Amino acid sequence: MAHLKRLVKLHIKRHYHRKFWKLGAVIFFFLVVLILMQREVSVQYSKEESKMERNLKNKNKMLDFMLEAVNNIKDAMPKMQIGAPIKENIDVRERPCLQGYYTAAELKPVFDRPPQDSNAPGASGKPFKITHLSPEEQKEKERGETKHCFNAFASDRISLHRDLGPDTRPPECIEQKFKRCPPLPTTSVIIVFHNEAWSTLLRTVHSVLYSSPAILLKEIILVDDASVDDYLHEKLEEYIKQFSIVKIVRQQERKGLITARLLGAAVATAETLTFLDAHCECFYGWLEPLLARIAENYTAVVSPDIASIDLNTFEFNKPSPYGSNHNRGNFDWSLSFGWESLPDHEKQRRKDETYPIKTPTFAGGLFSISKKYFEHIGSYDEEMEIWGGENIEMSFRVWQCGGQLEIMPCSVVGHVFRSKSPHTFPKGTQVIARNQVRLAEVWMDEYKEIFYRRNTDAAKIVKQKSFGDLSKRFEIKKRLQCKNFTWYLNTIYPEAYVPDLNPVISGYIKSVGQPLCLDVGENNQGGKPLILYTCHGLGGNQYFEYSAQREIRHNIQKELCLHATQGVVQLKACVYKGHRTIAPGEQIWEIRKDQLLYNPLFKMCLSSNGEHPNLVPCDATDLLQKWIFSQND
């Protein structure tokens, strides 16, 4: 029996010896061929290819050969081990992530806010109020208002670390959870400043540090657009040394917001870019909703719900726990940005406050965007100068080229809205018109003529072809296969009023009897009488169109018409809205051959006699009743 066992073992040993000998021969042969393959592959590439490219291609070919060889010989190996599952290829944009939701501990901010004195000036976002100022304090206050166009005196007396009181957002915002998969991207916060007040700039920085999760905030980049104030140089450099996460980059000459933001984006290292102005305060949980939306949709360009910080008292207008009547961005035909209420279809689409608001345009001062997508869609127009028009240009471009522009109501950031800019423009306000022409030429197709009729500076720039080279912007439009402006108006902003592309007459309306023109006056959004003012030929408040319905329209921001009454003529909302509507008699005017403007309802004519234009019995010999409808200069 023992002898039999030895024979069996000897047989098995000889059997597997022959098997492993054959396997060894196969492996030796494989190694020889592999060396020859490597030499052969090396000589196939031209000398112009880089060393890195050759190595990569060699490795790929060798790997293919090795895998094929292994597949051929693996069947000869004893089946002793169950193979590990083969992993599928993962998209490069996806990162490994855990299931579930981020915890509060994971979303802990960069710094904890220091304890606050509830009675301190401006504490909890309350207004700063003082009943009496000394003569010196009054002078300081006036200097600050002149320099910054807000109450810097109040800002300087409010803590840089002030809290904003309880979180007053709606419950669904406070309780909102954020998925770990896909993971929230990191962000670089970019803040451009030019001669900014010390307290507002640093309160913005501290606000970001106290309200942004450390795992998401990669850096704060302060971009100095050639400030001349001493405190914004060595003193600022010294102050931010305490924060390794904050850095400063500087432009040596004033180039404006657009170029400064491009500089900040160029040095940013995070996955997303978040742009803020230098006089902001971030509310609780402001960053996560923005980044979560980008994680869901790579092409989403998202803005926070912008709360107002009072420019006089610095009171923070906190969000309501019951939600609010939100606004979205729009534009008028002078290409100015504005706000409007949400249309009913947008209100119905949103289930609660966590849902984004789709907006035709955005203010452009505060928003987040994927850095790769920012570069993909053409960042900013590098030939736009200083400031103005870049937000409308980006709004049109994002929508027309396949992206989405949204406002996230659960993200709240306060902003000091000034009534005017404290900064001068190195080349004057002409730069704004030039910027607007650049966006109109690229993105508005035939509708650009509506803008040019309303802005004579822009029309001159077009005539002189002084708007610069647009070839790169048109290349972007072609590369991204962007849709036309008709699509934008029909699909994204169907509520927009589109004036006649070819009105019967357009321009200013001048009195023959005196050197004055019809003028709508300041801030006349309807309901106020017209005025008479020195003719300037620049459009704007003196721009009117005579429509096919015989209306005299001033339709730059709203559809407004000359509205006849027994007394002075007013500017009121146009009644005619297209199909199934007609213009009422009060808004119908006839331009007679004798130069009278006749209203058939009252059977009277428009006169320039008096402070306000008014209706009087018609008299063809009265020069004050005669008008010239002329093209703008």
Swiss-Prot record:
Residues 134-145 have a biased composition (Basic and acidic residues). It is a single-pass type II membrane protein. It catalyses: L-seryl-[protein] + UDP-N-acetyl-alpha-D-galactosamine = a 3-O-[N-acetyl-alpha-D-galactosaminyl]-L-seryl-[protein] + UDP + H(+); L-threonyl-[protein] + UDP-N-acetyl-alpha-D-galactosamine = a 3-O-[N-acetyl-alpha-D-galactosaminyl]-L-threonyl-[protein] + UDP + H(+). UDP-N-acetyl-alpha-D-galactosamine binds at residues 519, 522, 536, 541. GO terms for biological process: apoptotic process; cell maturation; chondrocyte development; chondroitin sulfate proteoglycan biosynthetic process; endochondral ossification; gene expression; limb development; multicellular organism growth. It comes from the Eukaryota. Highly expressed in the reproductive tract, principally in the testis and uterus, and to a lesser degree in the cervix with only trace levels in the ovary. Also expressed at high level in sublingual gland, stomach and colon, with more moderate amounts present in the submandibular and parotid gland as well as the kidney. SMART domains: RICIN. Pathway: Protein modification; protein glycosylation. Catalyzes the initial reaction in O-linked oligosaccharide biosynthesis, the transfer of an N-acetyl-D-galactosamine residue to a serine or threonine residue on the protein receptor. Has activity toward HIV envelope glycoprotein gp120. Has activity towards EA2, MUC2 and MUC5. Probably glycosylates fibronectin in vivo. Glycosylates FGF23. There are two conserved domains in the glycosyltransferase region: the N-terminal domain (domain A, also called GT1 motif), which is probably involved in manganese coordination and substrate binding and the C-terminal domain (domain B, also called Gal/GalNAc-T motif), which is probably involved in catalytic reaction and UDP-Gal binding. This is Polypeptide N-acetylgalactosaminyltransferase 3. The lineage of its organism: Eukaryota, Metazoa, Chordata, Craniata, Vertebrata.
